[in-house]
């Protein structure tokens, strides 16, 4: 199983996890990221959730060069600077940057599970049906392309197979 499928399998297993109490940002992903239990508006965790997934999947080096960030904007800038940013032809495992209103940088991020025409199916941390970018749960969401700014495409191992390795698999 390649890195992107490991991440998606792990993400699927997290669906339904939520912060307690609601609205606190107190969630296991933040606790692991910061090293202690945090709460309050200063600790949004959509990007932290993705950091946690990569770390748990044994692929920490594919997220932000192995470093940490809780900022969607910082991660998008990194992807652009390192040739990992794509706009279109999205694939499962891409990290999708979203903006729901106004102009500017990303407000939210999730991992792409499936493309359905003009809709992307993502798994996201800190979302809900009532609050796109700060909803306090891990959920599978369907996002219209109009919200998508682009994606960070990590350099997954299954995309780096040599011709000899490919022939051996066949």
Positions of predicted regions on the chain:
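Active-site signature of cysteine proteases
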Residues: 115-160, 167
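Positively charged, low-complexity intrinsically disordered regions
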Residues: 27, 69, 141-142
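Intrinsically disordered, low-complexity segments enriched in small/polar residues
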Residues: 27, 31-32, 41, 76, ...
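Amphipathic, soluble alpha/beta structural segments
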Residues: 96-102, 107-111, 150-161, 165-170
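Poly-acidic low-complexity segments
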Residues: 19-20, 71, 144
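...with weaker cross-activation on analogous glycine-rich loops/strands in unrelated enzymes
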Residues: 2-8, 59-132
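Aromatic side chains
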Residues: 29, 49-52, 78, 97-100, ...
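N-terminal capping segments
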Residues: 1-62, 155, 163-170
């Amino acid at each position: 199983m390649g890195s992107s499928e490991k991440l998606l399998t792990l993400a699927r297993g997290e669906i339904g996890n939520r912060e307690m109490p609601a609205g606190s940002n107190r969630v296991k992903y933040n606790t692991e990221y910061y090293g202690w239990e945090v709460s309050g508006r200063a600790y949004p965790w959509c990007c932290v959730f993705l950091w946690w997934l990569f770390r748990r999947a044994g692929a920490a080096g594919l997220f932000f060069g192995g470093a940490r960030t809780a900022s969607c904007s910082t991660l998008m800038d990194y992807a652009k600077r390192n040739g990992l940013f794509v706009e279109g032809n999205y694939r499962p495992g891409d990290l999708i940057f979203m903006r729901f209103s106004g102009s500017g940088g990303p407000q939210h991020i999730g991992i792409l599970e499936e493309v359905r025409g003009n809709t992307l199916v993502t798994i996201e941390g800190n979302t809900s049906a009532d609050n796109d970018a700060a909803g306090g749960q891990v959920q599978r969401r369907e996002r219209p392309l109009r919200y998508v700014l682009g994606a960070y495409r990590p350099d997954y191992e299954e995309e780096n197979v040599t011709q000899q390795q490919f022939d051996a698999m066949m």
